[in-house]
A protein has these predicted regions:
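Bacterial N-terminal signal peptides that target proteins for export
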Residues: 2-16
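C-terminal motif of bacterial Sec signal peptides marking the signal peptidase cleavage site
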Residues: 24-28
Length: 379
């Protein structure tokens, strides 16, 4: 009998202890202000900390943003957590209001614009080159490619590295009878938009069969996530070819081709040739394509990248201070931040593009009142 009573007491005590532990855990979780979990209140605001901004989008510009946001944090104490998930992902997160800003190498389409729920501003950050990188064992030469040959490779019409179309352009290179392994993006990508926009301009066949966009139905090849993923596919695949941003190619010590431009010149992607392509008349909303440039020394597969933010910043319980921190960050990016572009193989904005970016940022409001005042934030 005593044993039975002891068992009952033990079981009861154990159950009470477990219940108390569960209550303590639930209390701790509900009171936890860390980033590990979200409550229903969190869903209406990206963060309660106005000194910590959230961004997401383009992998194309990630090497530059990493530098800019580190420097800006050191200067101002404002932290920026940027998720390099691709332009499509950045647009979606901005639409869902889970980030303060997105970034895309493709301007919003008319359909995307309608779905955003309110006006979105496009602020140009810089321009960059999409390079055609390759991995042919034993070959260290810089290859030359024409627009039609590049299109045929991605259409699956040219499948061997020693195809006559490639050999005729590179007569001094001993190209092997190796299969071409095409790599492309698997995620929604502004880099893809730049590349397919170019192919659509130079190849009627590509335009009619595939077209342009941040995501397309690829006729051939394997997909990788982000510029990092495509670079990885090229490096690990003998015979590989793919399109990546210039900074990724240089940082990974990868070969990339000279591309023939509209003027008939074979152009190496550099800061100078990207800047030449970007020397265009920019409209007031900054949405412009740089591909297939008319500039004789311009690299033909170049493009801008844009920070995206809602014009009216009073939404989802955002504070005025948070809105000011975001606009101040982007203002710094288009001014002092431009000094870091060339060192990371991006082309800084021209004076004209900077002036347009300034006007766009000056149109941002909080409860209808401009966030930037005359002469403000010009340092």
């Amino acid at each position: 009998m005593t044993t039975e009573k002891n068992l009952i007491v033990f079981k009861t005590t154990t159950m009470v202890a477990i219940a108390l532990c569960l209550i303590s855990l639930l209390a701790a979780c509900s009171g936890n202000s860390g980033s590990g979990s979200k409550t229903s209140a969190d869903k209406t605001s990206v963060s309660s900390d106005d000194k910590s901004l959230l961004g997401a989008g383009s992998t194309f510009v990630y090497p530059l943003f990493s530098k800019l946001f580190y420097v800006y944090d050191q200067k101002t104490g404002v932290r920026i957590n940027y998720q390099s998930i691709g332009s499509g992902g950045g647009i979606l997160q901005l639409k869902n209001k889970t980030v303060d800003f997105g970034d895309s190498d493709a301007p919003l389409s008319d359909e995307q614009t309608k779905g955003m729920g309110a006006e979105v501003l496009h602020v140009p950050m810089c321009s960059g080159a999409v390079v055609i990188s390759y991995n042919i064992p034993g070959i260290t030469d810089t290859l030359k490619l024409t627009p039609d040959v590049l299109a045929d490779i991605y259409l699956g019409k040219v499948t061997k590295w020693n195809d006559a179309k490639i050999k005729n352009l590179n007569s001094t290179v001993q190209l092997p009878a190796m299969n071409i392994a095409v790599a492309h993006r698997s995620d929604g990508s502004g880099t893809t938009n730049i590349f397919t926009d170019y192919l659509s301009k130079i190849s009627p066949d590509w335009k009619s069969k595939v077209g342009k966009g941040t995501a397309v139905n690829w006729p051939a090849g394997l997909g990788g996530k982000g510029n990092e993923g495509v670079a990885g596919l090229i490096k690990q695949t003998p015979g590989g070819i793919g399109y990546i941003e210039l900074a990724y190619a240089i940082q990974n010590k990868m070969l990339f081709a000279q591309i023939q431009n509209k003027s008939g010149n074979f152009v190496t992607p550099t800061i100078a040739s990207t800047s030449a392509a970007g020397n265009v008349q920019m409209p007031a909303d900054s949405k412009v394509s740089l591909t297939n440039t008319d500039a004789p020394d311009g690299y033909p597969i170049s493009g801008f990248t844009w920070a995206l933010l809602y014009k009216e910043q009073s939404y989802s319980s955002r504070s005025k201070n948070r809105a000011e921190n975001l606009v101040n960050l982007l203002w710094w990016n288009i001014h002092e931040g431009q000094n870091y572009c060339a060192g990371l193989y991006y082309a800084p904005l021209s004076k004209e593009a900077t002036a347009i970016a300034e006007n766009i940022l000056k149109s941002a409001t909080y409860k209808g009142t401009p966030i930037l005042t005359a002469g403000a934030n010009s340092k």
